[in-house]
Design a protein with these regions (language model features):
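Midchain, well-structured core segments that form catalytic/ion-binding scaffolds
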Residues: 117-120, 126-139, 172-299, 308-310, ...
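Short, conserved micro-motifs enriched in small and acidic residues
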Residues: 28, 135-146, 228-236, 383-390
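N-terminal capping segment at the start of a domain
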Residues: 2-28, 129-130, 318, 378-379
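A non-catalytic alpha/beta surface segment that caps or lines the substrate-entry region
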Residues: 22-70, 74-76, 80
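Active-site metal-coordination/substrate-binding segment of hydrolases
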Residues: 67-164, 169, 189
Length: 405
């Protein structure tokens, strides 16, 4: 079975994670795909395939004769889809021999324009897989799941030599909880790759340092007719706080290695207002500056309006994996070689986000990220192609073979 055929099956299983639940997994529906994958792994010959109570799927293949001394290699992808768009009743559409032009999504009439998505032109002649316009596709990261499963199937069917192979599928990556309960000792790998990136040939080993901040403003309400020199309007103070942040350090004005402050939510009235931010930067020192800047703005406003008017709570989310990958840079070098063996040139760009691999790397399992062949994640314009998924599968097989040498 080819990877895209598995993808078409997996995306029809509803696995959207729930950021509000506070449970692990965040949604019981994630077990539906987990149990399906366990049964599929067992049918392929992965005898120890299992799912734990938190919806983590594990399995392994013992090393083939002569490869017992080779390192244990892990391959990891996540099963959940992002809550940013509906992941229920996904209806994937295949566009065979795609002409490289604008694409109309049939259920809504939405048009994916090449002017907005220039990468589409590079897919000319391939079989493009899109949504029907009503949901996301789920290639993030069910394409990664499908490619790992297909690589495992190929290894077993063809009797390819390999060291110990460890397979892991996680829940809740999209809400930042994918690695939180991952059993690294039970997984059994010396190092691993997540398969959760962009185009075929990408290898990612740098990501943002990340934090979240909640700003609470306490106002003082009096009748507006007699409010002069007395009222403190919390909503106005909130706008003043946000206005003190640099306009050119927002997601919509940054790229590459530029960090940002992202206002995710705001609400309030005269008495109280709240601002929710995420802070991102590849440079840890620059992220610390952003944290300090929030505190400095709060201190200034408290001096202006009174102590306790503005409170800032900051929590770290994840860290740049680069520091943990550098001592194991063979992972990047092997990926580069495997990508070139597949006829592609490696694409190495810092991730403007995070991956399970970043958290796992800091937990002791070095874990760079590989591409899945997907684009436009988290929305109705998400897409991939049959051929790019095939190339990603071949890259995995090349990596397995290189570590068996």
């Amino acid at each position: 079975m080819r990877a895209y055929e598995r993808l078409l099956n997996y995306v029809r299983v509803y696995t959207t994670s729930d950021p509000e639940s506070g449970t692990h997994p965040s949604a019981a529906r994630e077990f539906d795909l987990a149990h399906q994958l366990v049964e599929e792994l067992k049918a392929l010959g992965v005898e120890d395939a299992r799912v734990d109570e938190h919806c983590y799927v594990y399995g392994s293949l013992p090393a083939t004769p002569g490869c017992e001394d080779k390192p244990a290699l892990g391959l990891i992808a996540h099963m959940d889809t992002a809550p940013d768009a509906s992941g229920e009743n996904v209806n994937p559409i295949l566009h065979e021999n795609y002409d490289g032009g604008d694409v109309t999504l049939p259920a809504t009439g939405m048009v994916m324009k090449v002017s907005a998505f220039p990468f589409l032109a590079s897919m000319k002649g391939e079989t493009l897989i899109t949504t029907d316009g009503t949901t996301l596709l789920g290639a993030d990261d069910k394409a990664g799941v499908a490619e790992i499963m297909t690589a495992v199937e190929t290894v077993l069917e063809k009797g390819l030599p390999h060291g110990k192979l460890c397979i892991g599928f996680t829940p809740d990556e999209e809400i930042g909880e994918g690695a939180s309960l991952f059993d690294i000792p039970g997984f059994g790998a010396d190092f691993a790759y997540t398969v959760d990136g962009g185009d075929a040939g990408s290898v990612e080993y740098e990501n943002f340092n990340a934090a979240a901040a909640t700003v609470t403003i306490h106002g003082f309400s009096v009748h507006p007719g007699s409010a002069k020199d007395t009222m403190i309007n919390a909503s106005n103070v909130a706008m003043e706080f946000h206005g003190a942040l640099p306009v050119m350090a927002r997601p919509e004005t940054t790229e590459g290695r530029q960090g940002f402050y992202h206002l995710c939510q705001m609400y309030g009235d005269v008495t109280e207002a709240k601002l929710g931010y995420i802070l991102r930067d590849h440079d840890a020192a620059k992220l610390q500056f952003k944290k300090d800047n929030l505190l400095d703005i709060a201190a200034y406003l408290n001096g202006k309006y009174g102590d306790g008017t503005v409170e800032v709570e900051i929590k770290d989310s994840y860290r740049n994996m680069l520091e943990k990958i550098k001592p194991h840079f063979h992972l990047v070098e092997t990926a580069r070689k495997a990508i070139r063996m597949a006829g592609l040139e490696p694409e190495e760009v810092p991730v403007r986000g995070g991956t399970d691999g970043a958290t796992l790397s800091w937990m002791g399992l070095p874990c760079p990220n590989l591409g899945t062949g997907g684009f436009n994640f988290h929305g109705v314009c998400e897409c991939t192609t049959v051929e790019r998924m095939d190339r990603c599968t071949q890259i995995l097989l090349n990596i397995i073979g290189l570590y068996a040498e």
